[in-house]
Amino acid sequence: MSRFPRVYAESTIARMNKKLALPQETMSLLYDYFEAFANLYQLLPLKDAYKIISRQNKGLITLDEFIAFSEIARHEDHFYYILAKDELYLNAPKEKPIDREIVHSCLVDIDYEDYYNMADHQAGKPLKILPKQELLKYKEEMYIADTTYVRAMTNFLRTRLKMSEDEINYTISDFILIITCDDKPFDAVSKMLDRKNILMTKSQLEDFIKLFTDLSNNTRMPQNRGFTPLELSANRGGQKVINSISFGPNITAAFKSGEADIEEYRKGILMSELPEKFKMDMLRQLSQIEGKNTTPKKVGRNDPCPCGSGKKY
């Protein structure tokens, strides 16, 4: 198992390009596709890459020309690699060039664990093929699709949290990065907001949870081979969804110091329209912050209703 393919000298690449003799316009389009594949899927077999390109550009390139191009790209310096299984696994048999994969550098630059995890996540899932115009937008490293859910979150950050336009752009980018890269996006985003010392009222927090859940479930994921979680759920009849959120240390400290009213938050959670899993998890955390037993106390016949209305239960 070798580390990475060697980067060839410019003179060698020039000779390979001259031998291939494709028009510059075609070469540029192929590079755009490979960059888009690396960003959108992070891991994509060359066979699938050729299928997409051929389907969207009839007669553009033959299979032999595609393989020759991939050999050139394999030995250039990009943010992705063209790798074979025998370069990723011990004792793997040597593969034909068309059996190699486009692999984003983030999966293999430190070690191969991220690659193995991505391969496991993608296994058995169908491939989402976007229309050509939309697909090629992903050649930009941090392209963010202009969806209803992105616009809704942007509006929340602008009008409810009073962020500047620069802060909004950075924050949305961070959210998308967390959603696509983290196994527990709500925990990660809670820690991110905590680091930035962003505290929300109970109303803001309730709205944020809904918006972030929608954003998460409607963002294209490399793990899902380009599908959003909701698309894949509809396609396969079920998909893991987010069902919890953790309070960060600054928010916890605000509760303990009295800066944030824990009882008001509790009432807001109970009266909210959040999913029950969210409610129960957040109430459990509030009880832990207070130092109480997390086991709910049995409510008696004449005890006040836990909704905070003051009525008898």
Segment roles from a protein language model:
Residues M1-Y313:
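Acidic/negatively charged segments and metal-coordination signatures
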